[in-house]
Amino acid sequence: MTEPSYLTATRASYDTVAVDYAERYGNALASMPLTRAMLAAFAELVQAAGDGPAADIGCGPGHVAAHLNALGVPVFGVDLSPKMVEVAQQRYPGLRFHEGSMTALDLKDGELGGIVAWYSTHHIPTEQLPVVFAEFHRTLAPGGHLLLGTHVGDERLHLQRAYGHPVSYESCLLPPDRITELLAEAGLIVSARLLEEPGEGRKRPHVCLLARKPEPS
């Protein structure tokens, strides 16, 4: 099967910027107390459920996975970009990272106790998000949790330069209510939302959504 062009373009772009991206964002959590609070809540929920490891889907240079690991969560990372996987593995040799696409995860049904998708789903065209959210639902155990962070907007951007390099990828921005609807349609129910308004270092609002795959009644 031919790979969709947006995946090919996104992979190539992040292979190009991987090292510079890691230098810019690799320690970003140190100055993001609200994000750390949401990650801590997610970690507590995943540990309490005890339904399996967490996966950082679209893990980039691995800093979010490493933070969760430090909180006691067994976690591994998946990224579309082999160069990002290489950078993450070099930065955190004690963790496991591998290549993969969130559109077709090489994971068993119900294998995960938690999923983090941190600023990765916005690279998926809106019409393909149901496929991704269905994969999240499939791979989560009943009662498992999803933490999704992303930019807020209502537009589709095409980026041609990022992190000092030429790139070619899209960023598909949605309002939080629309993301919540799409998650619900996939069977993932949002229980908490953190919205950060534009401010220092942020040109756009950011949202963090905590969702859960319900257990059978």
Regions found by a protein language model. Give the residues of each.
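Conserved class I S-adenosyl-L-methionine
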Residues: 1-49, 154
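A short acidic, Gly/Pro-enriched loop at the edge of an enzyme's catalytic core
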Residues: 103-115
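Conserved beta-strand signature within the Rossmann-like core of class I S-adenosyl-L-methionine
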Residues: 144-150
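Short, glycine-/aromatic-enriched active-site segment of Class I SAM-dependent methyltransferases
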Residues: 152-170
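Short alpha-helix
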Residues: 171-186
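Core SAM-dependent methyltransferase catalytic element
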Residues: 198-217
